[in-house]
Amino acid sequence: MLSILIPIYNFKVVDVVLELKAQAEKLDIPFEILCFDDASSTHKDTNITLQKEANIQYRELNNNIGRTKIRNLLVEKAKYNNLLFLDCDITINKPNFLASYAPYFNSGHVVCGGVAYQKEKPEKTQELRWKYGRNREEKNASLRNQSPYQSFTAFNLLAPKDIFQKIAFNEKIIGYGHEDTLFGIELKKEGVTVAHIDNPIIHLGLDEHQVFIEKT
């Protein structure tokens, strides 16, 4: 039924993964959570404790392959047709987060849940990224549905696995977020329906000013 796919890089994911597991168990469906670490230098000692959990597959890569390739690897290894992509630097503040996606399982549609940011200001060095996220990325579903393909992001995304037989994340793209833009264009070309719903997760991993400027 559901494969939850989380690429990890230098972020502690134990709490959010266990929350996802608890929500999936309440749905009473077959599920798996694939957590693939992209050769991180931090938090592996903590994250590896997920290996003992049922329905969770935690794997550490020997070499860093980048978020595009690791997403494609997660798709390849997923065993169910409903794929839920989540970034690792998140928190979930909705007890019905997975249940809100359930009506779209096996729909054949791509569904974007959206992103939110904490209301409290972060440290000064991260304030630019936070303001950008609050002003440019945090949009409700009605606004995103006005231009569904332009608003596409794989940060919080439900998609049927068979779509990836036609389209994959482009591994030649190295710019920040541009692989999502290109994937959205390909979805439009293939006539795949992209729907946006109000089911956001909170983005925690804010880059410092200089790093964010270099990425964009």
Q: Language-model segments: what does each one mean?
A:
Residues N10-E25:
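Short, well-formed alpha-helical segments that are part of the catalytic scaffolds
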Residues Y176-F183:
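Acidic donor-binding loop at a coil-to-helix junction in glycosyltransferase catalytic cores
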Residues L61-A78:
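Glycine-rich, basic loop-to-helix element that forms the pyrophosphate-binding segment
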Residues P95-Q126:
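Conserved donor NDP-sugar-binding/catalytic core segment of glycosyltransferases
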Residues G114, W130-Y149:
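Short, flexible, basic/aromatic active-site loop/helix in glycosyltransferases
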Residues C35-T46, I90-T91:
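A conserved acidic beta->alpha catalytic loop
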Residues N140-A159, I174-Y176:
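A recurrent flexible, glycine/aromatic-enriched loop bordering the glycosyltransferase active site
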Residues L83:
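Short aromatic/hydrophobic "clamp" motif used to bind/position activated sugar donors
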